[in-house]
Structures are given as C-alpha cells and as structure tokens.
Amino acid sequence: MEGGCKVIITTSREPSKKTLELVNDLVNSLPGTSKIVRGKKSFITLLEEAVACGARYIAFIWERRGMPFALLFYDVINREWKPYMLKISGIKTRREFPVFISRRPPAKSAVIVDLSEGEVGDIFTEIFGYPILYSLDAVRGLFDTVVLIRRTDGYLVELLGSDLGPRASSIRIKKVVYRHV
C-alpha cells in the first residue's frame, strides 16, 4: 500500500469477481486511492490500516447477491459515517463494453465533470478532492481520468480517459439515500 493515499476502497466480506473488478478499476483510474483486500478483517483493522496509510476516507462497496449494491463512506479522521449512501443499480465492467478496453496505466490526475448538476458530483468532490467542472469540452486531454456524471433514471458515473473514451467500469446509481448516523 502506498503512503499518502486519500481514500481507501474496500468491499464487504467475500466479494464477487464483478465487485473486485470494479474495485481494481476504481483504484487504477482514481489517483489518491488505494485498495485494502477485506478478507476476514474487522472494521477496527481496516481503520488501523487506513490511518497507517494516511487516508481521510474509506469507501465501502457493499454487495447483495453477488452484485455491488451500495457505496458508503467513512470519515477516518472524525470517526463517523457520512450521512449518505449511494445505491448502485448496476455496473458495466470493461469486459461488457462492445469494444475491447485495455487497462491503462494508473492515473495521476482526475477531474469530475457533472452534467447532472446534482448531489453525486458534490459527494465525489468532497470524498476524492478532485476539481468539479460542468462542461465536458474544457477537459479533453488535460486529465488522465474524467469522472463524468450524467442524469439518467438516477445517475450514470462513467470513468473516461483523457481522450474521453471509456477507461474503466461505469456505475449506475439509482439514488442517494440520506440516513441518520
């Protein structure tokens, strides 16, 4: 694990191959992230590893019936869960795209382009610390990863390369659930 990571990405116990592929794509595409293989580690052990890494947040990908179901965030410094949960209604891995998408080198820079102008862009900016823009034309060729957020039935989060072609998995977010923590 690298020092100086901002966000640790991990899963629930015994994740499916699809969830692991999503985690690997996220870590490869989002600079400042690192993954922790959960295994049988307790929550306290995950916190200790996050503190040792210097992470600010832990992003948990929970799954239900072998599919990613929700994305939750834990603030390591304040020792509290963030009050929102992103409910995932589906993902599309690199293998499911109609053309072959090879894995690119790890990203060194990223930007969020929020065409939905909704809350998901603000959440991603808070957690990952990337700048947020509202126009796709302004970022072509400037960043290794463009996190494009579009409005559909919920939200569609696409990870694009600097050429604005697909870089990694895309995530369909059904809704943002605010909960009492």
UniProtKB/Swiss-Prot annotation:
Domain called Brix: residue spans: 5-181
MF terms from GO for this chain are: rRNA binding
One record GO biological process = rRNA processing
PROSITE patterns, sorted: BRIX
Keywords from the UniProt entry: Ribosome biogenesis
Disulfide-bond pairs as recorded? none
Q: What does this protein do?
A: Probably involved in the biogenesis of the ribosome.
Q: Which HAMAP family match?
A: BriX (MF_00699)
Protein name listed in UniProt: Probable Brix domain-containing ribosomal biogenesis protein
